[in-house]
């Protein structure tokens, strides 16, 4: 049973399928993650599993967090995530979550922070068309009109403008696992995932599997 796992993006490569076609893939070093806490309905009001990933130094973890992590075994972990489950039966504190819990062909959702690009303008951030570059034009990369004057006399909230681009958490849904390498803790996932190489990723079973009905399910 796959609950979810934390991993690190290694980069992109290509994978040849049975027909010899080159498929773009992302290599993810996932786990092993340690179960750091088990929650149940009696004590916490819901059932969940908390896992940790990525060892770190003692000076970077405060004392309460150290005490919490020491209950599940040796080694201080940098990243913690919690996953809701129906029941925690069969799981034990200090147990390991590995890529072996996943299988080839399984659909997963991958969450992570996108590459931060800093303050960006209208063209780069939103794909606006630029103005004329010659013939005396001074409106090269400006946005153009942002609204009327007297009415409404203001710029509506949510107007697409220049600002910080990237550096936000997003989820890429429905990616297919093409290969599981338990020896090297690797997941080979079809397509791209958020972030740059070295970024932390949260991989969990897909919430929605299969195509959505064209008529909305009616």
UniProtKB/Swiss-Prot annotation:
Molecular function per GO: rRNA binding; structural constituent of ribosome
Keywords for the protein's UniProt record, in alphabetical order: Ribonucleoprotein, Ribosomal protein, RNA-binding, rRNA-binding
InterPro entries to which the protein is assigned, alphabetical: Ribosomal_uL3, Ribosomal_uL3_bac/org-type, Ribosomal_uL3_CS, Transl_B-barrel_sf
A cellular component annotation (GO) from this entry: cytosolic large ribosomal subunit
Disordered: annotated segments: 124-162
GO annotation (BP), single: translation
SUPFAM superfamilies linked: Translation proteins
Pfam (any one): Ribosomal_L3
Record PROSITE patterns: RIBOSOMAL_L3
Positions of disulphide bridges: none
Function: One of the primary rRNA binding proteins, it binds directly near the 3'-end of the 23S rRNA, where it nucleates assembly of the 50S subunit.
Alphabetized PANTHER family for the sequence: 50S RIBOSOMAL PROTEIN L3, LARGE RIBOSOMAL SUBUNIT PROTEIN UL3C
Record-stated family: Belongs to the universal ribosomal protein uL3 family.
Subunit organization: Part of the 50S ribosomal subunit. Forms a cluster with proteins L14 and L19.
Name by which UniProt lists this protein: Large ribosomal subunit protein uL3
Organism: Synechococcus sp. (strain CC9605)
Gene that this sequence comes from: rplC
């Amino acid at each position: 049973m796959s609950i979810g796992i934390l991993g690190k993006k290694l980069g992109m490569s290509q994978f040849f399928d049975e027909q010899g076609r080159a498929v773009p893939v992302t290599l993810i070093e996932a786990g092993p993650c340690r179960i750091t806490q088990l929650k149940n309905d009696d004590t916490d009001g819901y059932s969940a599993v908390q896992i940790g990933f990525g060892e770190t130094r003692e000076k970077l973890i405060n004392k309460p967090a150290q005490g919490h992590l020491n209950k599940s075994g040796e080694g201080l972990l940098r990243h913690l995530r919690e996953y809701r489950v129906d029941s925690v039966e069969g799981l034990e504190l200090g147990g390991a979550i590995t890529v072996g819990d996943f299988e080839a062909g399984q659909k997963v959702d991958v969450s992570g922070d996108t590459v931060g690009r800093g303050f960006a303008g209208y063209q780069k951030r939103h794909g606006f068309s630029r103005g004329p570059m010659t013939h005396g034009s001074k409106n090269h990369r400006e946005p153009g009109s942002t609204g009327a004057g007297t009415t409404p006399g203001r710029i509506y909230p949510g107007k697409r403008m220049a600002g910080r681009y990237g550096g936000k958490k997003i989820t890429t849904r429905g990616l297919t696992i093409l290969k599981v390498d338990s020896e090297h803790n690797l997941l080979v996932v079809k397509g791209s995932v958020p972030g740059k190489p070295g970024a932390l990723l949260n991989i969990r079973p897909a919430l929605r599997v299969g195509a959505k009905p064209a008529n909305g399910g009616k």
